A protein has these predicted regions:
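Conserved nucleotide-sensing/catalytic segment adjacent to the nucleotide-binding pocket
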Residues: 2-34
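Alpha-helix initiation/capping motif
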Residues: 3, 7-10, 41, 63-66, ...
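Short hydrophobic/charged patches on amphipathic alpha-helices used for structural packing
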Residues: 18-19, 40, 75
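Acidic, Mg2+-coordinating active-site environments of NTP-dependent enzymes
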Residues: 24-26, 48-167
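Short beta->alpha connector loops
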Residues: 34-37, 93-94
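Conserved helix/coil segment N-terminal to the catalytic DExD/H
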Residues: 37-44
C-alpha cells in the first residue's frame, strides 16, 4: 500500500508502480491523469491506448489561471496516444472540439448527434436510470449513483471497456 499525495504520482514513482503492476501480471491500467500532472510532465514517456474527456469546469483555475490553459493541459493527454487510438469525448461539453484530434478514433457521447446517444435519463435519490443508443441498438440500464454528470461518467467508462474488447 502506498499513500499518494497527488492524483497522478511523480514520474519515478509512477513508473515504479507500473513496473510492479506488470510483475504481478497486470495487463491493463486505468488511471486518472490530472491536468496538473500533464502540465508538469508527470506522465512523460507514456503513451495511452485510450483516453477520455468528460468535462472542463472551473475547478483548477487557481493553478491554470484560464480555461484555455486548463484545456491545453488536458489536451496533452489526447496527443499522447499510440497511432489511431480511441478517444471518448463528451460532446455536450462546450470545449469538446479541442479534444477531437484527427489522428484519434473519436467516439462522442451526448444528447444530440453523438455516437453514444443519451436518449433519456431519470434521477432518484438512490439511482439513475439511463436509456442510450449505440450502433443502432437501444439500451436501458440503471446505476447506483446520482447526478447527471454520472450519466456521462458511466457511459464513458462503459465505452472504454467495450473498446478494449470486453462485453
Amino acid at each position: 500500500k502506498r499513500l499518494l499525495n497527488n492524483t497522478t504520482p511523480d514520474t519515478d514513482l509512477l513508473y515504479d508502480m507500473l513496473l510492479e503492476a506488470k510483475e504481478y501480471g497486470c495487463e491493463y491500467v486505468v488511471m486518472e491523469v490530472s491536468s496538473h500532472a500533464l502540465d508538469k510532465n508527470r506522465v512523460f514517456g507514456l503513451e495511452f491506448d485510450e483516453v477520455a474527456f468528460t468535462n472542463l469546469t472551473q475547478d483548477h483555475l487557481d493553478y491554470h489561471k484560464t480555461l484555455e490553459n486548463y484545456a491545453n493541459a488536458k489536451r496533452k493527454l489526447f496527443e499522447k496516444t499510440r497511432g489511431e487510438k480511441v478517444a471518448i469525448i463528451n460532446k455536450d461539453d462546450p470545449h469538446h472540439e479541442k479534444f477531437m484530434l484527427n489522428e484519434n478514433k473519436n467516439i462522442t457521447i451526448g444528447k444530440n448527434d453523438a455516437d453514444v446517444l443519451i436518449k433519456n435519463y431519470s434521477l432518484s435519490h438512490l439511482h439513475t436510470k439511463i436509456q442510450f443508443s449505440y450502433e443502432d441498438k437501444i439500451y436501458d440500464t440503471q446505476i447506483n449513483m446520482v447526478g447527471s454528470y454520472n450519466v456521462y461518467n458511466y457511459l464513458t467508462a462503459l465505452m472504454l471497456v467495450h473498446k478494449l474488447g470486453f462485453s
